[in-house]
C-alpha cells in the first residue's frame, strides 16, 4: 500500500534510532530476532549466528515478541525452505544469480554460499544504509538500494550479468504490499528474465481480513497489517503468459511438534491453507 511514514510511538521503541522510513521495514528486526532465538535452541532447524551478532550490536529490546510461537516457527520454516531452494539453485545452475528482494538484515549469503554464483541483496535505500553497517557487500554478494517496483535495477542486473540465469526470492514481504504493485513487479520480471524462478510466500484473503489474529502483527498497531492475499494457486498465471505455477508448500503441515496447540488451527477452514510458500517459473520463451 502507500508508504507509511515513520512515527515514533510506544510500540516502535524496538527500532528507535535506526531511521527506517517505512514501518514494514521494521519487520526485518522481528525476523532477525526469531532467527536468533532459533539459533540458541538445542533442537534448532536453522543456524544463523549473524542474526545473534547483529541483535547484540543493535541492543534493541525485542522481549515483547519472546512468546510469539506461531510467528517464530513460521519464520523459521520459511527461512529453511528459501535457504534450501537457494542452495539447490547455486549447486545446479551453471551461472546463477539469486536476488533477495526486501532482504532486510537477513544474511542468506552466509548461510548458503558454497563458493559459486552471485547473491544480490536489495531493499529500500534507508534499510540498505543500516544493512551496510553490519553486512558489507562483496563482489559475489553485491547490494542495491532501490524499490523492488522500479525497473532500473532489473536492467542493471541484466547488463552486469549477461548469460546468467536469475532467481528471485521475496520472503515475508508481499502480504504487506499493494496487489497492483505486486502484479506490476511480476510482469516486469516475467518480461525481462526468461527461465527465472520466483520464490515467495503468501497469505490467503481470509488471513488478510483477519490479520489482527496474527500474534506478532498485533503488536504493531495499525501501521503494519496484511494487505494482499492469494487464494487460487494459479491466479498469478493470469498476469503474464510467461508466469507458470510450479509448487506450493504449506507451513502448518511441517514440524508439527513445534507448533504445539497451534496445529488445531488446521480445523479452521481459513487457517489450514492460509499461509503458503510458492514457486513460480518464468517460461524460457518469454520475451518483452
Please give the residue ranges for each predicted region.
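Core SAM-dependent methyltransferase catalytic element
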Residues: 258-288
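Rossmann-like AdoMet
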Residues: 5-99, 103-146, 151, 156-158
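Conserved beta-strand signature within the Rossmann-like core of class I S-adenosyl-L-methionine
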Residues: 192-205
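Short alpha-helix
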Residues: 224-250
Amino acid at each position: 500500500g502507500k508508504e507509511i511514514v515513520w512515527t515514533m510511538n510506544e510500540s516502535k521503541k524496538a527500532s528507535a534510532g535506526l531511521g527506517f522510513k517505512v514501518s514494514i521495514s521494521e519487520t526485518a528486526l522481528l525476523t532477525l530476532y526469531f532467527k536468533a532465538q532459533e539459533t540458541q535452541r538445542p533442537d534448532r532447524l536453522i543456524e544463523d549466528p549473524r542474526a545473534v551478532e547483529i541483535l547484540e550490536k543493535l541492543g534493541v529490546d525485542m522481549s515483547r515478541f519472546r512468546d510469539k510461537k506461531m510467528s517464530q516457527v513460521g519464520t523459521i520454516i520459511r527461512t529453511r525452505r528459501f535457504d534450501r531452494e537457494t542452495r539447490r539453485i547455486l549447486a545446479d545452475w551453471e551461472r546463477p544469480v539469486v536476488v533477495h528482494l526486501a532482504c532486510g538484515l537477513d544474511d542468506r549469503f552466509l548461510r548458503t554460499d558454497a563458493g559459486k554464483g552471485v547473491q544480490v541483496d536489495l531493499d529500500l535505500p534507508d534499510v540498505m544504509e543500516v544493512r551496510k553497517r553490519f553486512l558489507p557487500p562483496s563482489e559475489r554478494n553485491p547490494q542495491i538500494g532501490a524499490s523492488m517496483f522500479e525497473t532500473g535495477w532489473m536492467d542493471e542486473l541484466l547488463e552486469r550479468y549477461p548469460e546468467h540465469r536469475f532467481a528471485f526470492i521475496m520472503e515475508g514481504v508481499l502480504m504487506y504490499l499493494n496487489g497492483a504493485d505486486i502484479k506490476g513487479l511480476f510482469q516486469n520480471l516475467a518480461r525481462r528474465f526468461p527461465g527465472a524462478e520466483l520464490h515467495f510466500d503468501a497469505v490467503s484473503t481470509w488471513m488478510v481480513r483477519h490479520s489482527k489474529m496474527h500474534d506478532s502483527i498485533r503488536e504493531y498497531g495499525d501501521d503494519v497489517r496484511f494487505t494482499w492475499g492469494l487464494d487460487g494457486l494459479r491466479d498469478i498465471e493470469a498476469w503474464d503468459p510467461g508466469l507458470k505455477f510450479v509448487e506450493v508448500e504449506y507451513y502448518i503441515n511441517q514440524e508439527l511438534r513445534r507448533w504445539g496447540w497451534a496445529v488445531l488451527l488446521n480445523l479452521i477452514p481459513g487457517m489450514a491453507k492460509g499461509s503458503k510458500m510458492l514457486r513460480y517459473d518464468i517460461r524460457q520463451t518469454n520475451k518483452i
